[in-house]
Amino acid sequence: GLKKAKGNIQTSPEYKDLTNRAQRALNNNYETHPTPYKAANLMGQDANQLYTAYRATGEQRYADKMLACTRALLASTPDPKLINDFYCGDVLFLLTHTYDACYDRLNQEELQKIEDLTFQIAKYHHNVQRKGRVENHIFDNHYWQRAYREMLQIGLMFADKNDTAKEILEYCYELWTARAPASGFNRDGEWHNGQGYFHSNVKTLWYVPSLMSYVTGTDFLQHPFYKNLGKALVYA
């Protein structure tokens, strides 16, 4: 697990790249931007590197940076146009992962502000879900690449204390079992809009089934799509 990994992480061939990426994020000063929300997507992208480094190494400086960025957002006026899927995904990643990594360092007011802002941003995407568009549309690339993953994480994080999160979690689970991976009826491992675009979807494709397998005890990677994926990529 993570505790064991922290003791051996420096021997990993990926350690240098991991810490270099995190260092570049540390060197940025987006939290000092006069209008923090104009740099919020960049903060979120940095948070991806910082959170990974924090969990892998346990070094507090990475969490400190995430916390500074989050507090900058909490102290400013939210962007009323928070609906773009990738922009929202970056902001939600920063908020939820700071909430996770720094929970004990946030006061009750800050925790509540993060929760409120998270659901304020997620509301638009959840309304899209509730209208039935995603399960009936052939395939919304941006939703599956990013918004779905963030919504699933929100559902898991807050389902025990928030009815909307519980609804989101239930929806995401049912949607995955009905329409994923790769639209739900793809069994041959081919990526429907071309293997050259596969890389944009790969994080959702490995993260979600791995997470659901862990939570449910059922191996979601046994789906025929995954069984045939390697061969499909080779012959694409």
Predicted regions and their residues:
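N-terminal module-boundary/linker segments of secreted carbohydrate-active enzymes
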Residues: G1-S12
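Aromatic-lined, polymer-binding surfaces characteristic
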Residues: Y15, T19, Q23, N27-A236
